[in-house]
Amino acid sequence: MAHKKGASSTRNGRDSNAQRLGVKRFGGQVVGAGEIIVRQRGTHFHPGVNVGRGGDDTLFALSAGSVEFGVKGGRKVVNIVVPA
């Protein structure tokens, strides 16, 4: 039985596409309602005031305002500060 599989046969050659995760809008930036703030796997950042969380844990703005990152109860949270 051959211990090599023969010519032009390989088990390599796979490379997945990047997932384009990360922070898309940084602290102090102004966003509109529905804009994506963070794309993530799991809840590295938790949604705060005026921020929603999608089924794939994406954080998005629920209302227009400026982005604010902070900590609450030991968790990193993202808030949207609405101008008065």
Curated annotation (Swiss-Prot):
Listed under GO cellular component are: cytosolic large ribosomal subunit
* A biological-process GO annotation: translation
**Entry's Gene Ontology molecular function annotations:** structural constituent of ribosome
Which superkingdom does the taxonomy of this entry point to?
Bacteria
Pfam families, sorted: Ribosomal_L27
Q: Which UniProt keywords apply?
A: Ribonucleoprotein, Ribosomal protein
Query: What ranges does the record give for the region Disordered, renumbered to this chain?
Result: 1-21
Instruction: Return the Polar residues bias intervals.
Output: 7-19
Q: What is this protein called?
A: Large ribosomal subunit protein bL27
Question: What is the name of the gene encoding this protein?
Answer: rpmA
